[in-house]
């Protein structure tokens, strides 16, 4: 029996997964993230016409981290030809940790996909080349999508990440040695870490990313960020590469394109219907929200939704 989407359903799902809190681990390699209370839990759904359903801590903002990689790729697709992007970044799953250097060396500086650190750094490098103020431009895009000018970066998180950026800097310099990085490394790292340090709530994330369920168009339908084909391509990349080394498990359990961040957020797309955003800071072994993934799995089951 397929269940109707409403706030009561979302509340019920959160109660089902709340016992999982305590079984994961909050990201601690970024000190500012380690301070987030582990018991936070929220979910929100935004339909194509802008209707919002929500439960739990869905209005509380948190660091979106790698979810921002979808936004930076979207922005790059509006500024570059697809050929220009995909000759510098691949479309394949990595099978390696998100910040691994080994594969990059073997494959001569071309990252496997835009949703690992390596690929996202190349995308940020491309944005740095085309935009006079890439940090401000991404903020403007998000504020316009969400219709909220108070969305901002957390300077403390950005600074904390920059202070622990040796590995990402090494990645960028290695790509530079292969001719796949054009701008000053530290400047691009500042942009990249600010993107990761954007703060949004589940409600805001669901509103923001509904364009991926709406063939590249914003909620009103009046503005196309990307083409319908590009929206499908981003969704395809999220299925194969959006959940670090847990993409196969997520596709198996949830059956939706998804992108996670180590802040505990996940977005998931049901094409032509809605976008879901969940948040629970404790992560599983792959770096994905443990309770958040379980909540999406239950929602998919109870509503009978899957792209497969």
Curated annotation (Swiss-Prot):
Pfam families: Glutaminase (PF04960). Keywords: Hydrolase. Substrate binds at residues 66, 117, 161, 168, 192, 244, 262. InterPro entries: Beta-lactam/transpept-like, Glutaminase. Transmembrane segments: none annotated. The keyword Hydrolase applies. One of its GO terms (biological process) is glutamate biosynthetic process. Its EC number is 3.5.1.2. It catalyses: L-glutamine + H2O = L-glutamate + NH4(+). One of its GO terms (molecular function) is glutaminase activity. The keyword Hydrolase applies. HAMAP family: Glutaminase (MF_00313). Belongs to the glutaminase family. Homotetramer. This is Glutaminase 1.
């Amino acid at each position: 029996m397929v269940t109707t989407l409403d706030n009561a359903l979302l509340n019920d799902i959160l109660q089902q997964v709340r016992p999982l809190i305590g079984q994961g681990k909050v990201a601690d390699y970024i000190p500012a993230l380690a301070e987030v209370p582990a018991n936070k839990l929220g979910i929100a759904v935004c339909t194509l016409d802008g209707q919002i359903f929500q439960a739990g801590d869905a209005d509380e903002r948190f660091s979106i981290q790698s979810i921002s990689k979808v936004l930076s790729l979207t922005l790059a697709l509006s500024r570059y030809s697809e050929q220009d992007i995909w000759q510098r970044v691949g479309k394949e799953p990595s099978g390696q940790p998100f910040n691994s250097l080994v594969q990059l060396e073997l494959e001569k500086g071309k990252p496997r996909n835009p949703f690992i650190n390596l690929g996202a750094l190349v995308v940020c490098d491309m944005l740095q080349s085309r935009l006079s103020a890439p940090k401000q431009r991404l903020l403007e895009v998000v504020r316009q999508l969400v219709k909220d000018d108070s969305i901002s970066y957390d300077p403390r998180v950005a600074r904390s990440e920059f202070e622990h950026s040796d590995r990402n800097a090494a990645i960028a310099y290695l790509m530079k040695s292969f001719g796949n990085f054009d701008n000053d490394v530290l400047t691009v790292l500042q942009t990249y870490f600010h993107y990761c340090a954007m703060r949004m709530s589940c409600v805001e994330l669901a509103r923001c990313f509904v364009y991926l369920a709406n063939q590249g168009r914003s909620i009103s339908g009046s503005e196309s960020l990307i083409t319908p084909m590009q929206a499908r391509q981003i969704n395809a990349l999220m299925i194969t590469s959006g959940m670090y080394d847990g993409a196969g498990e997520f596709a198996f359990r949830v059956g939706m394109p998804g992108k996670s961040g180590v802040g505990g957020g996940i977005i998931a797309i049901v094409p032509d219907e809605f976008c879901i955003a969940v948040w629970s800071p404790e992560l599983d072994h792959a770096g994905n929200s443990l309770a958040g993934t379980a909540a999406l799995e239950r929602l998919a089951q109870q509503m009978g939704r899957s792209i497969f």
